[in-house]
From Swiss-Prot:
Name of protein: Probable elongation factor 1-beta/1-delta 2
CDD domains recorded: EF1B
The protein's role, per its UniProt record: EF-1-beta and EF-1-delta stimulate the exchange of GDP bound to EF-1-alpha to GTP.
Self-association state and partner proteins as the record states: EF-1 is composed of 4 subunits: alpha, beta, delta, and gamma.
Entry superkingdom: Eukaryota
Bias-annotated ranges (Acidic residues): 133-150
Pfam families: EF-1_beta_acid, EF1_GNE
GO MF annotations, alphabetized: guanyl-nucleotide exchange factor activity; translation elongation factor activity
Entry GO CC: cytosol; eukaryotic translation elongation factor 1 complex
Lineage: Eukaryota, Metazoa, Ecdysozoa, Nematoda, Chromadorea
Source organism of the structure: Caenorhabditis elegans
InterPro entries assigned to the protein according to its UniProt record, in alphabetical order: eEF-1beta-like_sf, EF-1_beta_acid_region_euk, EF1B_bsu/dsu, EF1B_bsu/dsu_GNE, Transl_elong_EF1B/ribsomal_bS6, Transl_elong_EF1B_B/D_CS
GO biological process: translational elongation
Residue positions, PTM N-acetylserine: S2
Acetylation among keywords: yes
Length: 263
């Protein structure tokens, strides 16, 4: 065999070896799988070439076996991890479902309590309405009573309207008072008849004299008790007494008010 043929065989073997190493680098990220693959030397022509090919095939087979083993191992771990996570998640879901069911039960209980508390006060008005309806059923003369009440109300309103109209057209009432006066003389020698004439001689707007009589005091002395009616806005009792005692001081000692009544 020539030197050129031997170099061609070596170059061909090295090319296969480089392709396998590059595939290993790309797939395993730098991990060495073909650690047992050693470049062979062809010392005997065809024998060296066949030995190198056999070793290359064995290395490729070992690489595939190692790759399948690694993939199966990593996939099993991932599946186990996923199963554990799935179990944990399922447990959490069950716990949440139990919590939601408990909350729904509590909410339903609260709603039932509120419904009963609201229905209790409403029962009283309903009972009152039913009672009133029952009374209406047994009140045979209820409609007549209502008509009578309406008629009475109309009569009262008419009378009030008439009174208001009459009061508007008529002047207001005059405030008057009835006054009883005791007119006392100086002594028993005073002419009581003349004293009465002097008292009655007083004339004022709103003053009307009434009846009079003589009442004994003692020691033969008598006093004159006389009634008068005055209009409160026109006549003052104090002014009247002052006028009697001032104008007739020769006959009159004093004047006292016995009674004072509004008319």
């Amino acid at each position: 065999m020539s030197v050129e043929g031997l170099l061609s065989e070596v170059k061909h073997f090295n090319a296969h070896h480089l392709d396998a190493a590059l595939g290993e680098q790309l797939f395993y990220g730098g991990k060495r799988v073909f650690s047992d693959v050693k470049p062979g030397t062809s010392s005997g022509g065809d024998h060296g070439c066949k030995g190198g090919k056999s070793e290359l095939k064995g290395a490729i087979h070992n690489a595939k076996h190692a790759a399948d083993k690694a993939l199966n191992k990593e996939g099993g771990e991932d599946v186990s991890k996923l199963r554990e996570e799935h179990s944990a998640l399922a447990k959490k879901v069950d716990d949440l479902a139990s919590l939601v069911a408990e909350l729904q039960l509590q909410l339903s209980t609260l709603r039932q309590g509120q419904t009963s508390s609201v229905a209790a006060p409403a029962a009283a008005p309903a009972a009152a309405k039913e009672e009133a309806a029952g009374d209406d059923d047994f009140d045979l003369f209820g409609s007549e009573d209502e008509e009578e009440d309406e008629e009475k109300k109309k009569v009262v309103e008419e009378r009030l309207a008439a009174y208001a109209a009459k009061k508007a057209t008529k002047a207001g009432p005059i405030a008057k008072s009835s006054v009883i006066l005791d007119v006392k003389p100086w002594d028993d020698e005073t002419d009581l008849g003349e004293m009465e004439k002097l008292v009655r001689s007083i004339e004022m707007d709103g003053l009307v004299w009434g009846g009079a009589k003589l009442i004994p005091i003692g020691y033969g002395i008598k006093k004159l008790q006389i009634i008068t009616v005055i209009e409160d806005l026109k006549v003052s009792v104090d002014d009247l007494i002052e006028k009697i005692t001032g104008d007739f001081e020769d006959h009159v000692q004093s004047v006292d008010i016995v009674a004072f009544n509004k008319i």
